[in-house]
UniProtKB/Swiss-Prot annotation:
Pfam families: MOZ_SAS, PHD, SAMD1_WH, zf-MYST. Autoacetylation at Lys-523 is required for proper function. It is found in: Nucleus. InterPro entries: Acyl_CoA_acyltransferase (IPR016181), ARM-type_fold (IPR016024), HAT_MYST-type (IPR002717), Histone_H1/H5_H15 (IPR005818), MYST_HAT (IPR050603), SAMD1-like_WH (IPR048589), WH-like_DNA-bd_sf (IPR036388), WH_DNA-bd_sf (IPR036390). One of its GO terms (molecular function) is transcription coactivator activity. This is Histone acetyltransferase KAT6B. Keywords: Acetylation, Activator, Acyltransferase, Chromatin regulator, Isopeptide bond, Metal-binding, Nucleus, Phosphoprotein, Repeat, Repressor, Transcription, Transcription regulation, Transferase, Ubl conjugation, Zinc, Zinc-finger. The N-terminus is involved in transcriptional activation while the C-terminus is involved in transcriptional repression.
Amino acid sequence: MVKLANPLYTEWILEAIQKIKKQKQRPSEERICHAVSTSHGLDKKTVSEQLELSVQDGSVLKVTNKGLASYKDPDNPGRFSSVKPGTFPKSTKESRGSCNDLRNVDWNKLLRRAIEGLEEPNGSSLKNIEKYLRSQSDLTSTTNNPAFQQRLRLGAKRAVNNGRLLKDGPQYRVNYGSLDGKGAPQYPSAFPSSLPPVSLLPHEKDQPRADPIPICSFCLGTKESNREKKPEELLSCADCGSSGHPSCLKFCPELTTNVKALRWQCIECKTCSACRVQGRNADNMLFCDSCDRGFHMECCDPPLSRMPKGMWICQVCRPKKKGRKLLHEKAAQIKRRYAKPIGRPKNKLKQRLLSVTSDEGSMNAFTGRGSPDTEIKINIKQESADVNVIGNKDVVTEEDLDVFKQAQELSWEKIECESGVEDCGRYPSVIEFGKYEIQTWYSSPYPQEYARLPKLYLCEFCLKYMKSKNILLRHSKKCGWFHPPANEIYRRKDLSVFEVDGNMSKIYCQNLCLLAKLFLDHKTLYYDVEPFLFYVLTKNDEKGCHLVGYFSKEKLCQQKYNVSCIMIMPQHQRQGFGRFLIDFSYLLSRREGQAGSPEKPLSDLGRLSYLAYWKSVILEYLYHHHERHISIKAISRATGMCPHDIATTLQHLHMIDKRDGGFVIIRREKLILSHMEKLKTCSRANELDPDSLRWTPILISNAAVSEEEREAEKEAERLMEQASCWEKEEQEVLSTRANSRQSPAKVQSKNKYLHSPESRPVTGERGQLLELSKESSEEEEEEEEDEEEEDEEEEEEEEEDEEEEEEEEEEEEEEEEENIQSSPPRLTKPQSVAIKRKRPFVLKKKRGRKRRRINSSVTTETISETTEVLNEPFDNSDEERPMPQLEPTCEIEVEEDGRKPVLRKAFQHQPGKKRQTEEEEGKDNHCFKNADPCRNNMNDDSRNLKEGSKDNPEPLKCKQAWPKGTKRGLSKWRQNKERKTGFKLNLYTPPETPLEPDEQVTVEEQKETSEGKTSPTPISIEEEAKEAGEALLPQEENRRQETCAPVSPNTSPGEKPEDDLIKPEEEEEEEEEEEEEEGEEEEEEGGNVEKDPDGAKSQEKEEPEISPEKEDSARLDDHEEEEEEDEEPSHNEDHDADDEDDSHMESAEVEKEELPRESFKEVLENEEAFLDLNVQPSHSNPEVLMDCGVDLTASCNSEPKELAGDPEAVPESDEEPPPGEQAQKQDQKNSKEVDTEFKEGNPATMEIDSETVQAVQSLTQESSEQDDTFQDCAETQEACRSLQNYTRADQSPQIATTLDDCQQSDHSSPVSSVHSHPGQSVRSVNSPSVPALENSYAQISPDQSAISVPSLQNMETSPMMDVPSVSDHSQQVVDSGFSDLGSIESTTENYENPSSYDSTMGGSICGNGSSQNSCSYSNLTSSSLTQSSCAVTQQMSNISGSCSMLQQTSISSPPTCSVKSPQGCVVERPPSSSQQLAQCSMAANFTPPMQLAEIPETGNANIGLYERMGQSDFGAGHYPQPSATFSLAKLQQLTNTLIDHSLPYSHSAAVTSYANSASLSTPLSNTGLVQLSQSPHSVPGGPQAQATMTPPPNLTPPPMNLPPPLLQRNMAASNIGISHSQRLQTQIASKGHVSMRTKSASLSPAAATHQSQIYGRSQTVAMQGPARTLTMQRGMNMSVNLMPAPAYNVNSVNMNMNTLNAMNGYSMSQPMMNSGYHSNHGYMNQTPQYPMQMQMGMMGTQPYAQQPMQTPPHGNMMYTAPGHHGYMNTGMSKQSLNGSYMRR
């Protein structure tokens, strides 16, 4: 018959079907086409055609089930058919479908034949029966029938029903019915799975049986009743007929079953089955536990000399072959059962092999399976005996065994050992290591398959262990290592020492421990190597660095152990290397400035080695020091030995005596001189050269400090203590406020730390600094010790302290020393101390508490994770870690603290170039010593932080060093990092607690912004920080909230008395700053001011880390600290935001760092005014509070009246040429009070402090309120809901509400909190940023390309990046949603709380242009935005400003720009105006949509807006974008992703933005509306925006108030959670407007929209949101992206796009703006062009490509002029994003 289909193609199709079925999938047409096209390259269309033809041919079966077509191989229809097409004759095809040949088959006969042939004791499974039958050559015609398997199953089932077969589980056995000699047991269930089968022996078969006696000889019962009165079969003796119950005979069920099948004899009649002599030597007869046959012990095979213990099975039952045991037999059965590839049911290899007798066939069957050996084996098997095949009782044939032996011998040869492993007691007994073959001394816990080998092969460089020489040789060719994986810290001649971090090189260190255990008796550490540093000594030649030995030490050891384990390889022993390593460990201890000691207890060998070393060291010391007064302390200082060890050694040398109640050291000159003579005659082979050490300790202890230095330290300590008292007071207040986040003591200690460093500057050196405190205490000790007098003869030294100590082996002294060392002053980070010294030493103590972390016990540890880490001072160690002593250690080991990772990061950062910059800035930080200087420094710090963020690339190193830091509180660590690094995400944590006052959010945003600025390099850090921040953010947020809360109380009363408010805050800030200072000082001491900024960041990060860690446990303690941290970060953030904006504006790219400073100053100046303003209003009005915390926030939060008032302020700010100034103004408002104090300190301090204070205030204010209400995500969500409520209720009142009300709103609704953020955003970012952005972004705006790159760079590198509204906003967004999932939940609230997100968006929301256009708009908004498009934006801005965005108009607009809006940034760029116009036009369009004011319902309001808007365009198409659908996790994930890819961030954000745009679009649209709505919100100040905007006054006002910034944020992050419908609404709402807005604001606006939904304002945000969103994205750089992405989270795709958009710097936002404009398609297009250029410039090509992608989602979601928007949005959003990004 002619086939229609090509037979080759049919074969391919059948193969594909089999392949698909093997993968347990349904062979659908699509899968088949795909499989064939991938494997054979045939195009799918052809495959599809051939498949249809094959079906017509009948070559393929088509099966339709439930409307789905599947295809089957007619020859292999079932899953178990084992015949593969082509394996057997094609006869199968003819038999296809015809079962005629199966009708005459006797299935019972076949089944019985198979079961008996298989002879499986427990019965045979159907599968094995089938295999067996298929292997029978005479049954091929039957078995090849396709229906064979099915019919066989049916036959087996029927046979069981008929009683012919017995079924036990899956096993079938023949039911012989009577005991006729067949071996199959009758009672299958009783047959033991473990006992071998039994069968009659030849001589037993025809024996007569006696009639059974029906009574049990034991219990006299019958078969109806045994001893337990239960029926039981009787066993009867075949010879005498006496019977017994199995239970009476104590037979187990298995034995009973076997016995019933045999000829059983009772014990009297038992005959030996071997010799068959009855009654002979019955005492020596054994009874088989399987068949109960009897055997004489001498008749057994092999004969037995004594009775075996336990179960005994006779040779008859036992498998005969090779004496294989029962269990082996069982294993063989299992092997046999699974020998065939079950994975390939279609070709049962063994069966096929058995059926195919030719060698060729066998080989074919075996193709691809096993080695030729196996194939041959199978051939032999087949040819030798078919019967053997599947079911031999013995299963293993001779051939099998031979092959096995052969293979075993080969394998032994390969691993070069005899076939037996001699039992040497050590595993492995020999290792080959390099050119040495070394006998091991002890066993080591290598994996079993390696340890049991007689010889193990180790790579001498990477220490990997291998089984054979071959593997080693292969490995050595590939192994690229020639030295340990670490920094070389010592090199002299051919000796090097490497410092390997167990956390970074885990595998190497584990292998090193396993190797060491081979030569150490007592060693317990093998796998948990992360907390240890390994100092590996190598001998170097041309081949590499060969391992000589090593010692390990804990990074953070409470007991100051400097060695935990030490080992020298046997081939290098007795060459002085042990002494070398011991000496090296003490050298490190001396460098750390603290005494060290080996870990106790010592092993015998260790004791001998150490005692010899100690004796020589002390004798040499005494030889060189002939002073009359020799104290143990002096010896300790000189040698690094701990006093206890010195005392012990002196006792051993008999050189210590008790005289006159005191201890004296006796000089035994003979001993000393003899020792020195020996030394001269036999000089040491490998002497340690201290000058060759290139290593900086993390901790510097006081031991090495001179007396003067010690005195200085003492003085510093006293100062610190004083400061501590102040701090205590402050802390108590703050901690009370802070919900007892941190115990005052802890804060105190922190501050003390800071102070102590301050004081220490007196000492003047880093090392000395540390020692300052330590030495102060030590000094006292020493003074006591100095009292010791030495006799000239036996110069005796009396140590009053040491008298008792000495006797107690100086335990007391040791304790004293430890205390000293651990004492915070002592421990105060040496580096921090040093840095402080380097800095102008301002005795002015940090305002209330000196942050001195007093966990000195930790400090004791000197941990230098990496040399790099060591090199870096602990900028924020003090601040970050509560315990100074942990500093070095903390940094490395206490990463767990979360602080430490940051510290490390800081260290590593600090070394970077940024450090230089930061150093310059750090100089300001030097001022930190004083409260005012601290503030100054804080400003610098924030700048530095930004820069540090940039520097963070180095810190990233630290991260690398602490990949496992994650374990150690990575989250916290990351959080800290984020904070320090200016992670927006981190800062955004507050949004998580949306209710945090917007100020707080703003501050955080700013901080994040600043961090973000720094974060271009730190992006990876940011990513990590984001991850950490995700965990941390919520905590941070809570902390901040709490912090804010306390500050808020301060602020409320103190706002009017700025100084009062500022003072507590300032104090906190000062403390925070002090921490920063200390960190900075430390960094400076480290020698890098940059370190300082990094340090500040680190500190911030670390503190956040600590804070989160402590937060719950030590909330009281931490609260203040956290407050300080928060404040500091906040301030920094604020400042950073301002700086960033200023910087960006002033020098978008080039002067990022300098500009930030200038900006900072500008901002500070402005901020002082602004902060003051903000601070004052802050307490009075939510607006002000927000202002304080965040200008945007203030605006958003402020009630309409405040908004109205603030807008004036904001306009002032706007009018202020630089957005920085605007932000500054706002910052000043917030900061002014703080600034006043700062002013007291230094101008620089004031600058930074103003922001810090502002941030702190906002944080505290918000925190106080939010603290209560929004400590948890739940609270945050509640806040969101409240926001929604506020949206309706708070429309006008919200603005009107006092700060407290707003804050309450914050509490209840994130909106309020967002407001603060928007205010801050606006103020910090927008306001300052606008000018800065305009300057920086001026380029961006006009030529996106030009700006793109620089701007993007700036965005990433310069504070501006963070500064842009985006940064704040995005930080918040990212923080909330992205950095922390918790935050995201909160973010949901936050997102939903325009308040939270709108800190960025807020400005945007109200002043759509303001936020979106914020940078440009906001500024432009008031001025240029006002122009056509701008007009709307301005209106929106004004509305924003007047409404919740009060700040927006005046502050918000520019601030928004400055802080949050990349778009704003973009807009800020002069051309931005047009963009703004475009946006504005959108805003204008939005104006009508804004009428959707009725949207008051959060979600509904938005929808209403959108519906109204959309009624014309998208009216019906509200696509509820499942904003909320995005889980926080997803958001976080997205955020992380964004963070991970900063560049992609722009695009991603854009795309996501757009995608979300769809959903966000709606929200954005809504946001636009909301902005219009916000106008209503703004109603108090708001009609200004637009009547249309006002439509959802209710919605708008609350959302507006908080939402604008928060909205944007929330929208960005919250869009996810925000109303889907709302999003859709946005999309729908005003086709042009919404669409445009959506795209424009989509990212942030999405959040805004959500906010909008939640708050009418949110919609307002939409337009502004875009700018802001852009800003946010841009500011977020990473974080913003994430946030916006989260906003877009609503649509996962969108979210991704958002992420891209966010990366683009709010690409979405701009598109949203476009959306806004897109009502004006021209604008939209224009925007896209502009954004496109910008984006392209910024992101390179990505921007646009992504944007288009984004556009589709955007367009999709929006369905609003998707084309325009898509592109427009894409272009515009991207542009904005890019612009903001670039800035960043």
